[in-house]
């Protein structure tokens, strides 16, 4: 483990590393067997819905070729603000005047752009979401997956990401008075060599998240020194400082979450297993969950250490994305999401084909993990559709022919209330928005979905367009978090080509009697 210590502390750092290497952590052995996966039960759709015509989660090749018109089941479109499109992340805040605002990233400059930066969208009227302005400070030009709101301190922040090609800056905005007009508090590079912004170190943005109290922002750097996690002290929001950085014990960093008390971190190991080794029990998995003791950072001890205290890794997924600590029926669980299927990579055609040949699920999925004992997390459930079963391979592989990456599967998920989670909502590549009943985590069931129509013109703020994956009339990448509202039975999210979408549940499927959506408790 790499520690953010002066050179005189290097020996102590090596001692910590040797102690950690002696610990034994868990491997999800069930994931190493073949043909294990079962899909969740399908949603029962209403008479006026347009349900999927093939497998659950599938957009068949012939529909793509003809121009995909969308599917819906118990969810219907209420409003849309396409703008220039969107990219990877979205966030929400409701201010003291009860105005609801959406924030979402857009890609770096592409042809026909009108405005760069994070879009500020008024979604108070769900039928008429309106893009008001854009945030264009250095980290907001392309925050990638780091754009996050902290509700207790009423702050919006992002790091300079640009898909890991950014820099050490963090931008922090005050959104307390009027969420429609964020006020810049700081835009600073942390870790400067002169020590003026915390310990001297090189970091580059990509992913990130707040500690619940808003006093620390944690980031995942994919690039520097083979990848490192880092912690920024945001106690003084006008003068953020780098507190610590460390290298994960396996794979590279990505997303993360922190327990309510700030003491425990549920960080991801973004790894994968070569196709040839998927069924080889002698090859250990490198993708999954790393549990850290964050107490020394939370308590602001000098030269904080970040020991790893737990682990759960698997082979039936790769490129671990993020986690959400929740309680279901009073018991602690972790929602965990991958963005790649079995193998290595981002669900390319070759990866999916190889996974199918190994009788492993080809696409990424969400998982529910029991964290009653954070030192020994255990898998409870896999949450996925029929497209991700081995027997479906021959039917879905033709759908993705000619695509480069992110062909099917999860990216981000949210719950209704982390303190009493009843509902899981996930944005997926090509399969749209999927919503699940998780009140019984052993028997998850799908209750609704909405897969938007393919766009026929390019959205210049979409990374789906920027990286060449967009095809006119093809299905969208719904890659950002989903934001539920139990007070009126709606949700909003962004899909990269379609932009901001506001949706309403129909046929009385949601909210459940015990569902609630308090601010700041969804992801």
State the predicted function of each range:
Residues 2-3, 25, 122:
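Short intrinsically disordered, low-complexity coil segments enriched in acidic
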Residues 26-31:
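Boundary at the C-terminal end of the N-terminal hydrophobic targeting segment
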Residues 13-24:
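Bacterial N-terminal signal peptides
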Residues 32-523:
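Feature marking well-ordered beta-strand scaffolds used for ligand recognition
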Residues 10-13, 89:
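Residue-level detector of intrinsically disordered/flexible regions characterized by low predicted structural confidence
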Residues 1-9:
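N-terminal secretory signal peptides that target proteins for export/translocation
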